[in-house]
Amino acid sequence: MITDLTFTQLRDKLKNKELSSLQILRAFKDEYEKDLKHPLPLNGFVEFFEDAEEHAKKADELIAQGVSFDEKPLLGLPIAVKDNISMAGKLCTCCSRSLQGYYAPYNATVIDRLLEAGAVLMGRINMDELAMGSSTEFSCYGPSRNPVDRARTPGGSSGGSAAVVAGNQAPFSLGTETGGSVRLPASYCGIYGLKPTYGLFSRYGVVAFSSSLDQVGLFGKEAADIALGLAVMAGKDEKDETSEEADFSSLLKLSAYSKEEIASLKIAIPKEFLNTQGLDQEVKQVFDELCAWLTKNGAKLEEVSIPVLEASIPTYYTLAISEAASNLSRIDGIRFGLRKDTGKGNDELYIQTRSEGFGPEVKRRIITGNYVLSKEFSGDCYEKSLNVRAKIAQGVNEVLQKYDFIICPTAPAPAFKLNEKVDDPIAMYLSDLFTTFVNLARIPSLSVPAGKTKAGLPVGIQFCGKKFSEDRILKLAKAWEEQNA
């Protein structure tokens, strides 16, 4: 079936004129519409764009006219987009009641780059409200479901983006990540998910959660899919001063590491993660099997201690909620989105709009974030967390000066059941136990589907590298993929 093909395979079919863009789009749309009739639909798309077919037809016309894939590397390929990334003239609600009716007036830079490369935008994708959550249960459109087991979460906050790719409703999707929101869903759904180096992709046009941590991320079914998206989206953007120059155009054709190249690698395994009580033994077994494969190919693996990693979760959440409290003050009922005007003045307008517009998890984080930023506690909480973040980054980068990669499980356990942790925020936050250090250190990390539990639940292992080493990470992932297909 067309929908079983990877993003890279579909590109080859388009290049060879074996399939048209319209055929591809309609195949995925049919899967989406068929799933709507399922007793437990995935609920990945919150909107499938009506004009997508028109754009697919235009792509087919360009292909017929001889426009090359060198000029437009993603010509005719459909892509699904998380609902917090601006697409001009389209709703951008972040799956929050507070932003219902808000249409983006411009494109995010990453969207412009995809369109310039010829991609076709399929639709908006479900997410945890304002990107706050680890299960996609905090969405005003209802939860997304995991296509592997529909009683379970696809992860979050980009769970819808992972679900549509794993569920064959889209070949490729964009998510965003602040503390694990791409890698966690990728692990739970059994696909690839990349959190790039901070600054590799522009954040212009992405609704901010935590500005010092947020990054756009990518989902695909194989390593080469991620490489394609990375090649066209990376690089400096004058509209985002945190973006940096980077050229990954060579990744349009991804090659795997040879056995000799793998044999030259030194790889670090953080002891702190392997010795935690929360690590599921079946996840540990999958990790051990991947380590055995690396050792068999000659790589040198060593356990290392980075004690400060144990502070990753509290440090991450302290900083993230503080920045969220500041960033989300703009959603006030005055300029855009929901407006609940009682005629009793602006203070009452703010209170009513935000009380009705925000869900419980967003309220929890905003209230806690404002507490952290208050005059009495900012020194003890926020400023100390900034110092600990710097120590985490220093510790991780010192290891990466001696080793090529850090590897560890993406999540301590496989996907949990829907409603299992929705009323237990601490348990939910601990889903990010192995991911947040990457965001705090601003390094790249790829979640690689590495195996399954006895119950058939996917397990992801993450490959983490130095800043801007995405090409090397993807080469290693492709080698694993080719030898374990």
Swiss-Prot record:
Disulfide bonds: none
Gene3D superfamilies: Amidase signature (AS) domain
GO biological process terms, semicolon-separated: translation
EC class of the enzyme, as a word: ligase
Enzyme nomenclature, EC number: 6.3.5.7
Active site per UniProt: 82, 157, 181
Record GO terms (molecular function): ATP binding; glutaminyl-tRNA synthase (glutamine-hydrolyzing) activity
Catalysis performed (reactions): L-glutamyl-tRNA(Gln) + L-glutamine + ATP + H2O = L-glutaminyl-tRNA(Gln) + L-glutamate + ADP + phosphate + H(+)
Pfam families, alphabetized: Amidase
Domain of life per record: Bacteria
Matching InterPro entries: Amidase (IPR000120), Amidase_CS (IPR020556), Amidase_dom (IPR023631), AS_sf (IPR036928), GatA (IPR004412)
Signal peptide: none
Gene Ontology, cellular component aspect: glutamyl-tRNA(Gln) amidotransferase complex
Sorted UniProt keywords: ATP-binding, Ligase, Nucleotide-binding, Protein biosynthesis
Role according to the record: Allows the formation of correctly charged Gln-tRNA(Gln) through the transamidation of misacylated Glu-tRNA(Gln) in organisms which lack glutaminyl-tRNA synthetase. The reaction takes place in the presence of glutamine and ATP through an activated gamma-phospho-Glu-tRNA(Gln).
Similarity remark: Belongs to the amidase family. GatA subfamily.
Quaternary state and interactors: Heterotrimer of A, B and C subunits.
This protein's name: Glutamyl-tRNA(Gln) amidotransferase subunit A
Organism whose genome encodes this protein: Treponema denticola (strain ATCC 35405 / DSM 14222 / CIP 103919 / JCM 8153 / KCTC 15104)
Classification of source organism: Bacteria, Pseudomonadati, Spirochaetota, Spirochaetia, Spirochaetales
